[in-house]
Amino acid sequence: MGKYFGTDGFRGEANVTLTVDHAFKVGRFLGWYYGKNHEDGKAKIVIGKDTRRSSYMFEYSLVAGLTASGANAYLLHVTTTPSVSYVARTEDFDCGIMISASHNPFYDNGIKLINAAGEKMKEDVIAEIEKYLDGELGEIPYATRENIGCTVDYTAGRNRYMGYLMSLAIYSFKGIRVGLDASNGSAWTLAKAVFDALGAKTYVINAAPDGTNINANCGSTHIEGLQDLVRREHLDVGFAFDGDADRCLCVDEKGEVITGDHILYIYGCYMKDRDKLVGNKVVTTVMSNFGLYKAFDAVGIEYEKTKVGDKYVYECMSENGYRIGGEQSGHIIFSKYATTGDGIITALKMMEVMLAKKKTLSELAAPLVIYPQVLKNIRVTDKTQAQDDADVKAAVEAVANALGTDGRILVRESGTEPVVRVMVEAGSTEECEKYVDQVIDVIKSKGYAV
Protein backbone atom coordinates (compact mmCIF):
# COMPACT_ATOMS: atom_id res chain seq x y z
CA MET A 1 0.00 0.00 0.00
CA GLY A 2 1.14 3.52 -0.76
CA LYS A 3 0.85 6.85 1.00
CA TYR A 4 -2.55 7.59 -0.54
CA PHE A 5 -3.83 4.43 -2.21
CA GLY A 6 -4.63 1.28 -0.25
CA THR A 7 -5.80 -2.10 -1.51
CA ASP A 8 -9.18 -0.59 -2.41
CA GLY A 9 -8.22 2.83 -3.72
CA PHE A 10 -7.70 6.29 -2.20
CA ARG A 11 -10.24 6.49 0.61
CA GLY A 12 -10.97 8.80 3.52
CA GLU A 13 -13.19 11.58 4.80
CA ALA A 14 -14.24 13.87 1.96
CA ASN A 15 -12.22 17.12 1.85
CA VAL A 16 -10.23 16.01 4.90
CA THR A 17 -8.20 12.99 3.80
CA LEU A 18 -9.35 12.93 0.18
CA THR A 19 -9.83 16.42 -1.26
CA VAL A 20 -11.02 17.89 -4.54
CA ASP A 21 -7.41 18.88 -5.22
CA HIS A 22 -6.40 15.23 -4.99
CA ALA A 23 -9.18 14.26 -7.38
CA PHE A 24 -8.21 16.99 -9.86
CA LYS A 25 -4.59 15.84 -9.82
CA VAL A 26 -5.55 12.18 -10.26
CA GLY A 27 -7.55 13.24 -13.31
CA ARG A 28 -4.69 15.36 -14.63
CA PHE A 29 -2.25 12.46 -14.32
CA LEU A 30 -4.51 9.81 -15.86
CA GLY A 31 -5.45 12.03 -18.80
CA TRP A 32 -1.79 12.73 -19.53
CA TYR A 33 -0.48 9.21 -18.82
CA TYR A 34 -2.96 7.38 -21.04
CA GLY A 35 -3.02 10.16 -23.63
CA LYS A 36 0.57 9.26 -24.51
CA ASN A 37 -0.78 6.01 -26.01
CA HIS A 38 -2.90 7.89 -28.57
CA GLU A 39 -1.73 9.77 -31.65
CA ASP A 40 -4.19 12.56 -30.95
CA GLY A 41 -3.28 12.58 -27.25
CA LYS A 42 -6.85 11.88 -26.20
CA ALA A 43 -7.30 9.16 -23.61
CA LYS A 44 -10.78 7.67 -23.15
CA ILE A 45 -11.77 7.19 -19.51
CA VAL A 46 -15.07 6.04 -18.01
CA ILE A 47 -16.33 7.27 -14.62
CA GLY A 48 -19.02 6.02 -12.25
CA LYS A 49 -20.09 7.22 -8.84
CA ASP A 50 -22.22 6.24 -5.86
CA THR A 51 -24.88 8.36 -4.17
CA ARG A 52 -22.81 10.27 -1.59
CA ARG A 53 -23.22 14.03 -1.66
CA SER A 54 -19.48 14.42 -2.22
CA SER A 55 -19.46 11.99 -5.17
CA TYR A 56 -20.77 14.73 -7.46
CA MET A 57 -18.08 17.12 -6.26
CA PHE A 58 -15.33 14.57 -6.88
CA GLU A 59 -16.79 13.68 -10.28
CA TYR A 60 -16.56 17.33 -11.35
CA SER A 61 -12.96 17.56 -10.08
CA LEU A 62 -11.89 14.38 -11.86
CA VAL A 63 -13.55 15.48 -15.10
CA ALA A 64 -11.85 18.87 -14.87
CA GLY A 65 -8.48 17.19 -14.43
CA LEU A 66 -9.03 14.65 -17.19
CA THR A 67 -10.27 17.11 -19.79
CA ALA A 68 -7.59 19.65 -18.85
CA SER A 69 -5.06 16.98 -19.80
CA GLY A 70 -6.87 16.31 -23.07
CA ALA A 71 -8.77 13.14 -22.13
CA ASN A 72 -12.40 12.45 -22.96
CA ALA A 73 -14.46 11.60 -19.86
CA TYR A 74 -17.46 9.27 -20.20
CA LEU A 75 -19.94 9.53 -17.32
CA LEU A 76 -22.01 6.52 -16.27
CA HIS A 77 -23.41 8.67 -13.43
CA VAL A 78 -24.74 6.74 -10.39
CA THR A 79 -23.79 3.14 -10.95
CA THR A 80 -21.98 0.20 -9.35
CA THR A 81 -18.25 -0.47 -9.15
CA PRO A 82 -18.55 -3.72 -11.13
CA SER A 83 -20.40 -1.89 -13.91
CA VAL A 84 -17.41 0.44 -14.35
CA SER A 85 -15.16 -2.62 -14.50
CA TYR A 86 -17.43 -4.26 -17.09
CA VAL A 87 -17.61 -1.19 -19.33
CA ALA A 88 -13.85 -0.59 -19.08
CA ARG A 89 -12.97 -4.14 -20.12
CA THR A 90 -15.57 -4.61 -22.86
CA GLU A 91 -15.04 -1.31 -24.69
CA ASP A 92 -11.97 0.61 -25.81
CA PHE A 93 -11.42 2.57 -22.61
CA ASP A 94 -7.94 3.23 -21.27
CA CYS A 95 -9.14 2.91 -17.69
CA GLY A 96 -12.11 3.37 -15.39
CA ILE A 97 -12.69 5.38 -12.23
CA MET A 98 -15.26 4.66 -9.52
CA ILE A 99 -16.03 7.32 -6.94
CA SER A 100 -17.12 5.46 -3.81
CA ALA A 101 -16.11 4.53 -0.28
CA SER A 102 -18.04 1.27 -0.53
CA HIS A 103 -19.60 0.37 2.84
CA ASN A 104 -18.20 3.42 4.70
CA PRO A 105 -20.47 6.21 6.03
CA PHE A 106 -21.59 9.02 3.71
CA TYR A 107 -18.96 11.54 4.85
CA ASP A 108 -16.16 9.30 3.53
CA ASN A 109 -15.43 8.84 -0.13
CA GLY A 110 -12.88 7.18 -2.35
CA ILE A 111 -11.36 6.89 -5.79
CA LYS A 112 -11.05 3.36 -7.14
CA LEU A 113 -8.97 2.96 -10.29
CA ILE A 114 -9.64 0.19 -12.80
CA ASN A 115 -7.42 -0.76 -15.74
CA ALA A 116 -8.50 -1.58 -19.29
CA ALA A 117 -8.84 -5.26 -18.36
CA GLY A 118 -11.44 -4.37 -15.72
CA GLU A 119 -9.04 -5.19 -12.89
CA LYS A 120 -7.72 -3.04 -10.06
CA MET A 121 -5.05 -0.79 -11.49
CA LYS A 122 -1.50 -2.13 -11.34
CA GLU A 123 0.73 -0.92 -8.54
CA ASP A 124 3.36 0.58 -10.87
CA VAL A 125 0.79 3.04 -12.25
CA ILE A 126 -0.48 3.80 -8.73
CA ALA A 127 3.10 4.52 -7.66
CA GLU A 128 3.45 7.10 -10.46
CA ILE A 129 0.17 8.75 -9.44
CA GLU A 130 1.44 9.04 -5.88
CA LYS A 131 4.65 10.66 -7.10
CA TYR A 132 2.60 13.22 -9.00
CA LEU A 133 0.41 13.91 -5.97
CA ASP A 134 3.60 14.58 -3.99
CA GLY A 135 5.00 16.92 -6.65
CA GLU A 136 7.80 14.59 -7.68
CA LEU A 137 7.02 14.43 -11.42
CA GLY A 138 6.99 18.09 -12.31
CA GLU A 139 4.28 19.88 -14.24
CA ILE A 140 1.93 18.17 -16.68
CA PRO A 141 1.10 20.37 -19.69
CA TYR A 142 -2.44 21.65 -20.06
CA ALA A 143 -4.42 20.88 -23.19
CA THR A 144 -5.55 23.96 -25.12
CA ARG A 145 -8.03 24.84 -27.86
CA GLU A 146 -9.38 21.78 -29.69
CA ASN A 147 -7.10 19.52 -27.64
CA ILE A 148 -9.16 20.07 -24.47
CA GLY A 149 -11.10 16.88 -23.73
CA CYS A 150 -14.84 16.34 -24.04
CA THR A 151 -17.34 15.16 -21.44
CA VAL A 152 -19.85 12.55 -22.59
CA ASP A 153 -23.03 11.41 -20.83
CA TYR A 154 -22.73 7.65 -21.11
CA THR A 155 -25.72 6.05 -19.43
CA ALA A 156 -25.75 3.77 -22.48
CA GLY A 157 -22.79 1.96 -20.94
CA ARG A 158 -24.70 1.39 -17.73
CA ASN A 159 -27.69 0.13 -19.69
CA ARG A 160 -25.49 -2.28 -21.63
CA TYR A 161 -24.20 -3.65 -18.33
CA MET A 162 -27.80 -4.19 -17.20
CA GLY A 163 -28.39 -6.18 -20.37
CA TYR A 164 -25.32 -8.25 -19.60
CA LEU A 165 -26.63 -9.03 -16.11
CA MET A 166 -29.96 -10.17 -17.51
CA SER A 167 -28.18 -12.42 -20.02
CA LEU A 168 -26.57 -14.35 -17.15
CA ALA A 169 -29.92 -15.64 -15.85
CA ILE A 170 -30.66 -19.08 -17.30
CA TYR A 171 -34.03 -19.42 -15.55
CA SER A 172 -37.08 -17.19 -15.30
CA PHE A 173 -37.69 -15.69 -11.86
CA LYS A 174 -41.44 -15.58 -12.42
CA GLY A 175 -43.38 -16.21 -9.23
CA ILE A 176 -40.40 -15.78 -6.91
CA ARG A 177 -40.79 -13.14 -4.20
CA VAL A 178 -37.48 -11.33 -3.76
CA GLY A 179 -36.46 -8.68 -1.24
CA LEU A 180 -33.75 -6.19 -2.23
CA ASP A 181 -31.92 -3.78 0.07
CA ALA A 182 -30.17 -1.20 -2.11
CA SER A 183 -28.41 0.46 0.86
CA ASN A 184 -29.45 3.86 -0.53
CA GLY A 185 -26.46 3.40 -2.80
CA SER A 186 -25.45 2.41 -6.29
CA ALA A 187 -27.66 -0.68 -6.49
CA TRP A 188 -30.83 1.43 -6.51
CA THR A 189 -30.30 2.27 -10.20
CA LEU A 190 -29.87 -1.36 -11.28
CA ALA A 191 -30.95 -4.20 -9.00
CA LYS A 192 -34.74 -3.77 -9.09
CA ALA A 193 -34.77 -3.23 -12.85
CA VAL A 194 -32.81 -6.45 -13.43
CA PHE A 195 -34.94 -8.60 -11.14
CA ASP A 196 -38.18 -7.11 -12.47
CA ALA A 197 -37.11 -7.82 -16.04
CA LEU A 198 -36.40 -11.43 -15.12
CA GLY A 199 -39.91 -11.86 -13.74
CA ALA A 200 -39.41 -11.67 -9.99
CA LYS A 201 -41.91 -10.03 -7.67
CA THR A 202 -39.61 -7.51 -6.01
CA TYR A 203 -39.89 -5.80 -2.64
CA VAL A 204 -37.32 -3.03 -2.33
CA ILE A 205 -36.09 -1.11 0.70
CA ASN A 206 -33.50 1.65 1.09
CA ALA A 207 -33.72 2.83 -2.51
CA ALA A 208 -34.23 6.55 -1.84
CA PRO A 209 -30.74 8.07 -1.62
CA ASP A 210 -30.47 11.65 -0.38
CA GLY A 211 -26.68 12.02 -0.36
CA THR A 212 -26.30 11.30 3.35
CA ASN A 213 -28.18 8.04 3.95
CA ILE A 214 -25.98 5.62 2.00
CA ASN A 215 -25.21 2.59 4.23
CA ALA A 216 -27.05 4.27 7.13
CA ASN A 217 -28.44 1.35 9.14
CA CYS A 218 -29.09 -0.52 5.91
CA GLY A 219 -27.50 -2.72 3.29
CA SER A 220 -25.11 -5.61 3.77
CA THR A 221 -23.55 -4.15 6.93
CA HIS A 222 -26.96 -3.66 8.61
CA ILE A 223 -29.00 -6.52 7.28
CA GLU A 224 -31.67 -6.54 10.02
CA GLY A 225 -34.05 -4.45 7.91
CA LEU A 226 -33.98 -6.98 5.10
CA GLN A 227 -34.49 -9.82 7.58
CA ASP A 228 -37.60 -8.05 8.88
CA LEU A 229 -38.87 -7.50 5.33
CA VAL A 230 -38.42 -11.16 4.35
CA ARG A 231 -40.23 -12.36 7.48
CA ARG A 232 -43.00 -9.77 7.32
CA GLU A 233 -43.80 -10.29 3.64
CA HIS A 234 -43.08 -14.04 3.63
CA LEU A 235 -40.54 -13.67 0.84
CA ASP A 236 -38.60 -16.50 -0.79
CA VAL A 237 -35.22 -14.80 -0.53
CA GLY A 238 -33.57 -11.43 0.07
CA PHE A 239 -30.37 -9.77 -1.14
CA ALA A 240 -28.56 -6.88 0.57
CA PHE A 241 -25.90 -4.81 -1.20
CA ASP A 242 -23.32 -2.35 0.08
CA GLY A 243 -22.87 1.24 -1.09
CA ASP A 244 -21.24 0.46 -4.44
CA ALA A 245 -22.82 -3.00 -4.84
CA ASP A 246 -19.63 -5.01 -5.11
CA ARG A 247 -20.81 -6.97 -2.06
CA CYS A 248 -23.93 -9.01 -1.45
CA LEU A 249 -25.24 -10.92 1.53
CA CYS A 250 -28.43 -12.96 1.42
CA VAL A 251 -31.39 -13.67 3.68
CA ASP A 252 -33.09 -17.05 3.40
CA GLU A 253 -36.85 -17.64 3.46
CA LYS A 254 -36.74 -17.95 7.27
CA GLY A 255 -35.13 -14.54 7.64
CA GLU A 256 -31.69 -15.91 8.53
CA VAL A 257 -28.49 -14.34 7.20
CA ILE A 258 -26.53 -16.14 4.50
CA THR A 259 -22.94 -14.87 4.65
CA GLY A 260 -20.21 -14.83 2.05
CA ASP A 261 -18.97 -18.14 3.45
CA HIS A 262 -22.38 -19.70 2.84
CA ILE A 263 -22.37 -18.34 -0.71
CA LEU A 264 -18.94 -19.85 -1.38
CA TYR A 265 -20.12 -23.19 -0.04
CA ILE A 266 -23.40 -23.21 -1.97
CA TYR A 267 -21.87 -22.23 -5.28
CA GLY A 268 -18.78 -24.38 -4.78
CA CYS A 269 -20.96 -27.46 -4.29
CA TYR A 270 -23.09 -26.48 -7.29
CA MET A 271 -20.01 -26.22 -9.51
CA LYS A 272 -18.52 -29.46 -8.19
CA ASP A 273 -21.77 -31.34 -8.88
CA ARG A 274 -21.48 -30.21 -12.51
CA ASP A 275 -17.75 -30.99 -12.82
CA LYS A 276 -17.07 -27.30 -13.42
CA LEU A 277 -15.09 -26.47 -10.27
CA VAL A 278 -11.67 -25.74 -11.77
CA GLY A 279 -8.93 -27.44 -9.76
CA ASN A 280 -11.65 -28.62 -7.37
CA LYS A 281 -10.83 -25.44 -5.43
CA VAL A 282 -12.57 -22.42 -3.93
CA VAL A 283 -10.53 -19.35 -2.94
CA THR A 284 -11.16 -17.92 0.54
CA THR A 285 -9.37 -15.54 2.89
CA VAL A 286 -7.90 -16.28 6.29
CA MET A 287 -11.03 -14.74 7.86
CA SER A 288 -13.45 -17.33 6.46
CA ASN A 289 -15.16 -19.30 9.20
CA PHE A 290 -13.65 -22.57 10.42
CA GLY A 291 -16.99 -24.21 9.72
CA LEU A 292 -16.61 -23.50 6.01
CA TYR A 293 -13.47 -25.60 5.81
CA LYS A 294 -15.07 -28.46 7.70
CA ALA A 295 -18.02 -28.34 5.30
CA PHE A 296 -15.69 -28.29 2.29
CA ASP A 297 -13.75 -31.24 3.70
CA ALA A 298 -17.00 -33.19 4.09
CA VAL A 299 -17.84 -32.85 0.37
CA GLY A 300 -14.29 -33.15 -0.95
CA ILE A 301 -13.77 -29.54 -2.04
CA GLU A 302 -10.26 -28.12 -1.67
CA TYR A 303 -9.47 -24.47 -0.95
CA GLU A 304 -6.83 -21.78 -1.13
CA LYS A 305 -6.52 -19.16 1.62
CA THR A 306 -5.32 -15.63 0.86
CA LYS A 307 -4.76 -12.49 2.88
CA VAL A 308 -7.84 -10.40 3.64
CA GLY A 309 -8.94 -8.36 0.63
CA ASP A 310 -10.69 -9.13 -2.64
CA LYS A 311 -7.52 -7.95 -4.40
CA TYR A 312 -5.67 -11.00 -3.09
CA VAL A 313 -8.58 -13.32 -3.82
CA TYR A 314 -8.67 -12.17 -7.43
CA GLU A 315 -4.90 -12.49 -7.84
CA CYS A 316 -5.02 -16.11 -6.65
CA MET A 317 -7.96 -16.86 -8.93
CA SER A 318 -6.43 -15.28 -12.02
CA GLU A 319 -3.06 -16.95 -11.50
CA ASN A 320 -4.64 -20.40 -11.26
CA GLY A 321 -7.78 -20.11 -13.36
CA TYR A 322 -10.13 -20.71 -10.41
CA ARG A 323 -13.80 -19.86 -10.95
CA ILE A 324 -15.13 -18.92 -7.50
CA GLY A 325 -13.63 -17.06 -4.56
CA GLY A 326 -14.46 -14.40 -2.03
CA GLU A 327 -14.79 -13.11 1.48
CA GLN A 328 -17.10 -13.68 4.41
CA SER A 329 -18.26 -10.05 4.03
CA GLY A 330 -19.91 -10.81 0.68
CA HIS A 331 -17.22 -9.85 -1.81
CA ILE A 332 -17.68 -12.80 -4.16
CA ILE A 333 -15.86 -13.11 -7.48
CA PHE A 334 -17.22 -15.29 -10.27
CA SER A 335 -14.24 -15.12 -12.62
CA LYS A 336 -16.12 -16.44 -15.65
CA TYR A 337 -18.43 -13.43 -15.49
CA ALA A 338 -16.53 -10.60 -13.78
CA THR A 339 -13.09 -9.40 -12.74
CA THR A 340 -14.32 -7.92 -9.46
CA GLY A 341 -16.78 -8.74 -6.73
CA ASP A 342 -20.25 -8.06 -8.12
CA GLY A 343 -23.20 -8.03 -5.73
CA ILE A 344 -25.88 -8.33 -8.40
CA ILE A 345 -24.13 -11.23 -10.12
CA THR A 346 -23.85 -12.90 -6.71
CA ALA A 347 -27.61 -12.53 -6.23
CA LEU A 348 -28.31 -13.88 -9.73
CA LYS A 349 -26.08 -16.90 -9.13
CA MET A 350 -27.79 -17.72 -5.84
CA MET A 351 -31.13 -17.58 -7.67
CA GLU A 352 -29.71 -19.93 -10.30
CA VAL A 353 -28.65 -22.52 -7.73
CA MET A 354 -32.02 -22.36 -5.96
CA LEU A 355 -33.89 -22.88 -9.22
CA ALA A 356 -31.54 -25.56 -10.56
CA LYS A 357 -31.61 -27.55 -7.32
CA LYS A 358 -35.27 -26.78 -6.59
CA LYS A 359 -34.29 -26.01 -3.00
CA THR A 360 -34.66 -23.06 -0.67
CA LEU A 361 -31.62 -21.09 0.39
CA SER A 362 -31.88 -22.47 3.92
CA GLU A 363 -31.79 -26.02 2.56
CA LEU A 364 -28.75 -25.27 0.41
CA ALA A 365 -26.89 -23.67 3.33
CA ALA A 366 -27.87 -26.25 5.97
CA PRO A 367 -24.74 -28.48 5.78
CA LEU A 368 -22.52 -25.52 6.67
CA VAL A 369 -22.40 -24.98 10.43
CA ILE A 370 -20.91 -21.59 11.28
CA TYR A 371 -18.72 -21.70 14.38
CA PRO A 372 -19.07 -18.99 17.03
CA GLN A 373 -16.40 -16.34 16.53
CA VAL A 374 -14.93 -13.68 18.80
CA LEU A 375 -12.62 -11.03 17.38
CA LYS A 376 -10.96 -8.41 19.57
CA ASN A 377 -8.56 -5.63 18.66
CA ILE A 378 -5.80 -4.43 20.93
CA ARG A 379 -3.91 -1.19 20.27
CA VAL A 380 -0.18 -1.69 20.63
CA THR A 381 3.05 0.26 20.49
CA ASP A 382 4.54 -1.99 17.80
CA LYS A 383 2.21 -4.46 16.10
CA THR A 384 4.95 -6.50 14.41
CA GLN A 385 7.01 -6.78 17.57
CA ALA A 386 3.95 -7.74 19.61
CA GLN A 387 2.94 -10.45 17.17
CA ASP A 388 6.48 -11.85 16.91
CA ASP A 389 7.11 -11.91 20.67
CA ALA A 390 8.10 -15.42 21.84
CA ASP A 391 5.67 -15.42 24.77
CA VAL A 392 2.80 -14.22 22.59
CA LYS A 393 3.61 -16.93 20.05
CA ALA A 394 3.66 -19.51 22.83
CA ALA A 395 0.24 -18.35 24.05
CA VAL A 396 -1.17 -18.60 20.53
CA GLU A 397 0.29 -22.09 20.10
CA ALA A 398 -1.19 -23.19 23.43
CA VAL A 399 -4.65 -22.06 22.33
CA ALA A 400 -4.25 -23.79 18.96
CA ASN A 401 -3.29 -27.03 20.70
CA ALA A 402 -6.23 -26.75 23.10
CA LEU A 403 -8.68 -26.24 20.23
CA GLY A 404 -7.25 -29.06 18.14
CA THR A 405 -9.57 -29.85 15.23
CA ASP A 406 -12.57 -28.19 16.89
CA GLY A 407 -11.65 -24.56 16.26
CA ARG A 408 -8.86 -22.19 15.35
CA ILE A 409 -7.04 -19.04 16.41
CA LEU A 410 -5.83 -16.29 14.11
CA VAL A 411 -3.64 -13.38 15.18
CA ARG A 412 -2.85 -10.74 12.58
CA GLU A 413 -1.80 -7.13 12.25
CA SER A 414 -4.14 -4.43 11.01
CA GLY A 415 -3.04 -3.03 7.68
CA THR A 416 -4.08 0.52 8.55
CA GLU A 417 -3.96 0.94 12.35
CA PRO A 418 -1.52 0.22 15.22
CA VAL A 419 -3.68 -2.74 16.16
CA VAL A 420 -3.29 -6.50 16.58
CA ARG A 421 -6.44 -8.53 15.92
CA VAL A 422 -7.02 -11.73 17.89
CA MET A 423 -9.74 -14.02 16.58
CA VAL A 424 -10.89 -17.40 17.88
CA GLU A 425 -13.54 -19.75 16.50
CA ALA A 426 -14.69 -22.58 18.73
CA GLY A 427 -17.70 -24.58 19.84
CA SER A 428 -19.13 -21.81 22.04
CA THR A 429 -18.86 -18.05 22.40
CA GLU A 430 -17.67 -18.51 25.99
CA GLU A 431 -14.80 -20.68 24.83
CA CYS A 432 -13.87 -18.11 22.18
CA GLU A 433 -13.88 -15.30 24.76
CA LYS A 434 -11.69 -17.30 27.12
CA TYR A 435 -9.00 -18.03 24.56
CA VAL A 436 -8.99 -14.55 23.01
CA ASP A 437 -8.55 -13.01 26.45
CA GLN A 438 -5.70 -15.41 27.25
CA VAL A 439 -3.68 -14.13 24.31
CA ILE A 440 -4.56 -10.47 24.90
CA ASP A 441 -3.53 -10.80 28.55
CA VAL A 442 -0.08 -11.96 27.45
CA ILE A 443 0.23 -9.04 25.01
CA LYS A 444 -0.67 -6.67 27.84
CA SER A 445 1.69 -8.34 30.32
CA LYS A 446 4.61 -7.84 27.92
CA GLY A 447 3.95 -4.10 27.83
CA TYR A 448 2.84 -3.79 24.21
CA ALA A 449 -0.66 -2.46 24.90
CA VAL A 450 -1.25 1.27 24.54
From Swiss-Prot:
GO molecular function, one term: phosphomannomutase activity
Active-site positions on this chain: 102 (phosphoserine intermediate)
Catalytic reaction(s) noted: alpha-D-glucosamine 1-phosphate = D-glucosamine 6-phosphate
CDD domains recorded: GlmM
Cofactor: Mg(2+)
Coiled-coil stretches noted in the UniProt entry, renumbered to this chain: none
Pfam families from the UniProt entry: PGM_PMM_I, PGM_PMM_II, PGM_PMM_III, PGM_PMM_IV
Modified sites of kind Phosphoserine: 102
GO terms (BP aspect): carbohydrate metabolic process; peptidoglycan biosynthetic process; UDP-N-acetylglucosamine biosynthetic process
Keyword Phosphoprotein: yes
Bound cofactor: record note: Binds 1 Mg(2+) ion per subunit.
One GO cellular component, as annotated: cytosol
E.C. no: 5.4.2.10
Function statement: Catalyzes the conversion of glucosamine-6-phosphate to glucosamine-1-phosphate.
Name of the molecule in the record: Phosphoglucosamine mutase
Organism: Lachnospira eligens (strain ATCC 27750 / DSM 3376 / VPI C15-48 / C15-B4) (Eubacterium eligens)
